[in-house]
């Protein structure tokens, strides 16, 4: 969650301006999940780390939204990118995915844009770190690009650079001889001599 500084799936942040509280919503990992993921921070530990007012289980999110809707309060959300988030917004607010782009809050969009134009020292450190990793990703791709190597091999090595530095790719790596196709995914085709190859990658 960008505003909460937490990197874990299955969390929702609700900033309730009217009631002056910040909710961290999600479920604690149970014993069956620990077998798969190992020990992780509890919801309370994450709440303390990010400074949220309180935590609630995920089942409470619908109630939080319903209470706000019943009082005719405006619920602000950004235009969703992922399909699972579009479905979640539809379930919570009744806004169909086709209508979500225009229903998104322009007030919140402008606030986010304004806030993101100013960086704290920690954010600048992360940006500089990502730039160094991105440089290594691109120079690795340049070094490996030669006839007979597959697009998938090079893109796999490029992704591995990000992971080896404890980062993740900022988007699926684009590495293709078909640069005319936007967001072209790497294939098992071998690189051919004299062909132009497009690489777009980042951490």
Cite the ranges covered by each PLM segment.
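Active-site pocket-lining segments that scaffold enzyme catalytic pockets across diverse folds
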Residues: 119-143, 149-165
């Amino acid at each position: 969650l960008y505003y909460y500084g937490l990197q874990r799936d299955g969390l929702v942040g609700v900033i309730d301006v009217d009631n002056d509280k910040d909710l961290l919503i999600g479920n604690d990992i149970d014993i069956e999940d620990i077998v798969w993921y190992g020990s992780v921070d509890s919801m309370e530990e994450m709440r303390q780390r990010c400074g949220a007012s309180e935590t609630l289980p995920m089942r409470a999110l619908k109630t939080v939204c319903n209470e706000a809707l019943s009082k005719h309060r405006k619920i602000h959300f950004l235009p969703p990118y992922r399909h699972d988030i579009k479905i979640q917004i539809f379930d919570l607010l009744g806004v169909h995915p086709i209508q979500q782009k225009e229903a998104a809050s322009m007030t919140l969009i402008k606030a986010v844009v304004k806030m993101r134009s100013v960086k704290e020292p920690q954010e600048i450190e992360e940006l500089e770190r990502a730039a160094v990793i991105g440089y290594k990703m691109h120079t690795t791709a340049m070094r490996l690009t030669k006839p007979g190597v597959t697009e998938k091999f090079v893109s796999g090595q490029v992704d591995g650079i990000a992971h080896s530095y404890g980062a993740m790719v900022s988007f699926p790596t684009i590495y293709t001889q078909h640069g005319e196709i936007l967001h072209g995914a790497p294939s098992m085709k071998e690189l051919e001599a004299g062909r132009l190859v497009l690489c777009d990658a980042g951490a």
